[in-house]
């Protein structure tokens, strides 16, 4: 096999020497360069194909391993993220429940205090109403007693005044009647006097 590769090399070398050398710069060259041709044997071609196949197998295996590793790492990351998210969700849910329970407890306490306050206000209002009603009734009784006393006094005063007026009227009547009797008697007496004195003339 070495002999074949040596022969191939020497053949390639001799062919390459057969072309004229061009020492001028390539950008000034207008003639095309001929590419070197390498002659390979069937064995080297087979060996190359086998190497390419092995390289392709290795690349395929490495790609598969890399893909599996990425899948595994992605699955682990997803599981970890899911676990963390579930833990955070549970923690948030627990905190929300605690907050809700605390708020419910405070709302219950506030409701109880409000009911107690309403009961106290209602009781105080009823007590104040009863006191006011009692005071009003007492004041009404006093006013009624006062009015009754005033009425009795007025009645007594009116009756007393009526009696006094009656007495006064009787006094006046007696006086007037007495005077009129006196006047009548005097008039009769004067008339008699005159008549007797005219009889003498």
From Swiss-Prot:
Keyword Kinase: no
Record region (Disordered): 41-155, 177-201
GO biological process: cellular response to desiccation; cellular response to salt; response to wounding
Domain of life: Eukaryota
Induction: By desiccation (leaves) and by abscisic acid (ABA) (leaves and callus).
Polar residues composition-biased segments: 41-54
Keywords: Stress response
Family: Belongs to the LEA type 1 family.
Protein name: Desiccation-related protein PCC3-06
Taxonomic source organism: Craterostigma plantagineum (Blue gem)
């Amino acid at each position: 096999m070495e002999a074949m590769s040596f022969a191939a090399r020497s053949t390639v070398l001799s062919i390459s020497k057969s072309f004229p050398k061009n020492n001028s710069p390539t950008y000034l060259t207008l003639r095309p360069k001929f590419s070197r041709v390498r002659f390979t044997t069937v064995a080297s071609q087979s060996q190359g194909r086998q190497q390419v196949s092995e390289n392709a197998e290795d690349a395929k295996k490495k790609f598969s391993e890399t893909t599996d590793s990425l899948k595994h790492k992605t699955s682990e990351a997803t599981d970890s993220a899911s676990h963390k998210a579930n833990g955070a969700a549970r923690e948030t849910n627990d905190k929300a429940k605690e907050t809700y329970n605390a708020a419910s407890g405070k709302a219950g306490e506030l409701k109880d205090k409000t009911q107690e306050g309403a009961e106290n206000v209602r009781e105080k209002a009823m007590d104040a109403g009863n006191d006011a009603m009692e005071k009003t009734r007492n004041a009404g009784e006093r006013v009624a007693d006062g009015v009754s006393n005033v009425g009795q006094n007025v009645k007594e005063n009116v009756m007393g005044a009526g009696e006094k007026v009656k007495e006064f009227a009787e006094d006046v009547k007696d006086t007037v009647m007495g005077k009129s009797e006196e006047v009548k008697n005097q008039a009769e007496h004067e008339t008699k006097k005159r008549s007797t004195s005219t009889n003498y003339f």
